[in-house]
């Protein structure tokens, strides 16, 4: 915590090193000139983001990295295809409570060598509420550029921060307008109001015990690194066996972290994987399947045509030349090719459905983002004012309050009915004795003679029996 919460003096010095040519009140603009933001709002104006894979996927696209998506991991044992890294979200107060248990372990795996630290992208979180962007950049900027297209913004950031200290890298992230604007564009309106109420400089992601925090797990040079912007150094969890994948090592680390091995599952967490865009692999597979479909279909047509010519008596007809070495006419009959073509059609239909599902997911990501970021305050206030102007607001409020009153009235009625039921049940014991035929005859005779019926005939009867016994 002390390393993450750097003082204002070190922050000013780092900011001077990163943006020495810009004044504090200057306007920063992107390379295209479309995005402008006051310098004073960059480091202090970052907003909280939700932990949502759709939000993170759209955020990566806004960063300029288009061939990547983020998926939520529900089962650690389920294999994940070609992940770039993992983002682990946990409750910061719970990590702080468990600090005594893991402080010795983390101290042993800290990488304190400056040369080793400068060779990787590790940035300390010195800007409030930027942990989500930090986690994404810790994965992307430590990946091989041959396997991932970072885009102009991230490529410039990676080149600009090469050789910087972790603190200055964190300041460089916070003072990049493209990242700040993309980050804040996915925040809910409530996050902006909270920031305005509490004032800048206080990070709920860093200091509030009820907040959550993001950290990244990424393979670097055959070692599994944990990159936490609130820690002073990166953590090296070591390598993995030659017969293993790096995700196997990650599963063991997470199992120990979450207490799954010991049964202590008391940490609320969320796990997401940064993976290649699934649509790219599906599109490539569809292209291959359609190519094979065309080859098989063409070969089948030529084979059937040759068989028809042979049946018609044309002895000079030859077997067709295949367009590929994968299919030899002597190895496949017409029935085999028809069966293979049917399987290809099925595979194509399945992958087309998968591609449509992925596109629908992307569309829903955008719909959810619009709903998440839209400010409904003006609409609600205008709608209520129109109802009040038409004179129907009070009636609607009364109608909505009536069910609660009915419920309370029903509760009182139920209590009264219970009391009456209890009273009638208590009197039913005495009434049962008085309602017997013999007792009714006695009451009728007493009424005829002008005498009041006895209230306790049972007791008098017992007394007479005792007197008779004494005699």
UniProtKB/Swiss-Prot annotation:
Listed Gene3D superfamilies: 1.20.58.860, Peptidase C12, ubiquitin carboxyl-terminal hydrolase
Name of the top EC class for this enzyme: hydrolase
Main location: nucleus
Residue positions of the active site: 131, 213
Ranges of Low complexity composition bias in the record: 420-447
UniProt GO cellular component terms: chromatin; cytoplasm; PR-DUB complex
Reactions catalysed according to its record: Thiol-dependent hydrolysis of ester, thioester, amide, peptide and isopeptide bonds formed by the C-terminal Gly of ubiquitin (a 76-residue protein attached to proteins as an intracellular targeting signal)
Hydrolase as UniProt keyword: yes
SUPFAM superfamilies assigned to the protein according to its UniProt record, in alphabetical order: Cysteine proteinases
One Gene Ontology term from the biological process aspect of the record: epigenetic regulation of gene expression
One Gene Ontology MF term: cysteine-type deubiquitinase activity
Domain UCH catalytic: 45-276
E.C. number(s) listed in UniProt: 3.4.19.12
Site (Transition state stabilizer): residue numbering on this chain: 125
Annotated coiled-coil segments of the chain: none
Marked site: Important for enzyme activity: 228
Domain ULD: 375-403
Start and end residues of each stretch annotated as Disordered: 410-471
Compositionally biased intervals (Basic residues): 457-471
Annotated family: Belongs to the peptidase C12 family. BAP1 subfamily.
Name of protein: Ubiquitin carboxyl-terminal hydrolase calypso
